[in-house]
């Protein structure tokens, strides 16, 4: 039954994505924020499909920790689920992502129209410059910025190296950092066709001020907040 539900999901996902890709292309001449709203509706629609077809939904801890002003969301990255659900949880945001994603047929063209901050991970020095330059432009337009500080998807129970890019951007743009833990990998395994029913937890931690300590101390604080919450929400699922 799970396989059948996943097949149905992927069929509906494809139709849903094709429709919104056409809409997004037609909206290419519109201002960035209007184009972005189209992508947000698409993302929320996919989250709805996952809930209704697969039985995969989410809950939020720490909703009161979301600031009133645009900030930098530093989120654990375990699956594609958070790239969708975060758009329903936080205000209009752009993602920091690797530029190679632009080369994916259809999906890549849609990404470009969503005004992300694209970086070249093979050239760290250049990537930092790109984050700061493009980040300022997005901030000036009122966007929040979402970044995955470990730079890639991490399996549940594991931890990657936290890079300084988010803290450097926060310091340069004077934007606070909002650490977020998420256990989506327990229900949407890396490189898996199957998604599993359950409740993903997003644990939003108290913000880190952009002028807190040094850049290294900011990132250490972010890592500590995420990993502490991460252990709790993953353990909670295992104990069910």
Q: Which ranges hold each PLM region?
A:
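Catalytic core of membrane glycerolipid acyltransferases/transacylases, capturing the structured
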Residues: 17, 21-40, 51-53, 68-124
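Generic preference for hydrophobic
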Residues: 60, 73, 95-96, 202-204
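Thr-Gly-centered strand-to-loop micro-motif
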Residues: 61, 97-98, 119-121, 149, ...
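Non-catalytic C-terminal accessory region of glycerolipid acyltransferases
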Residues: 129-240
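Membrane-interfacial terminal anchoring regions of lipid-handling membrane enzymes
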Residues: 1-28, 64, 137, 217-240
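Short gly/ser/thr-rich secondary-structure transition/capping motifs
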Residues: 52-61, 128-129, 183-186
């Amino acid at each position: 039954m799970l396989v059948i539900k996943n097949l149905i999901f992927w069929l509906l996902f494809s139709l849903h994505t094709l429709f919104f890709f056409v809409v997004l292309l037609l909206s290419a001449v519109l201002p960035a924020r209007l184009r972005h709203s189209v992508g947000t509706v698409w993302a929320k629609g996919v989250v709805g499909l996952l809930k209704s077809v697969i039985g995969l939904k989410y809950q939020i801890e720490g909703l009161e920790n979301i600031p009133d002003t645009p900030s930098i969301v530093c989120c654990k990255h375990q699956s594609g689920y958070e790239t969708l659900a975060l758009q329903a949880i936080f205000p209009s945001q752009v993602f920091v992502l690797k530029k190679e994603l632009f080369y994916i047929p259809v999906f890549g063209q849609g990404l470009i129209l969503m005004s992300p901050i694209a970086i070249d991970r093979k050239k760290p020095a250049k990537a930092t410059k790109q984050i700061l330059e493009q980040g300022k432009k997005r901030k000036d337009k009122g966007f929040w910025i979402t970044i995955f500080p470990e730079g890639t998807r991490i399996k549940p129970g594991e931890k990657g190296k936290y890079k300084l890019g988010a803290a450097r951007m926060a310091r340069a743009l004077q934007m606070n950092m909002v650490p977020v833990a998420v256990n989506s990998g327990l229900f949407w395994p890396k490189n898996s066709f199957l998604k599993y029913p359950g409740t993903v937890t997003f644990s939003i931690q108290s913000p880190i001020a952009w002028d807190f300590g040094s850049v290294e101390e900011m990132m250490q604080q972010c890592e500590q907040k995420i990993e502490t919450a991460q252990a709790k929400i993953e353990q909670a699922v295992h104990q069910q």
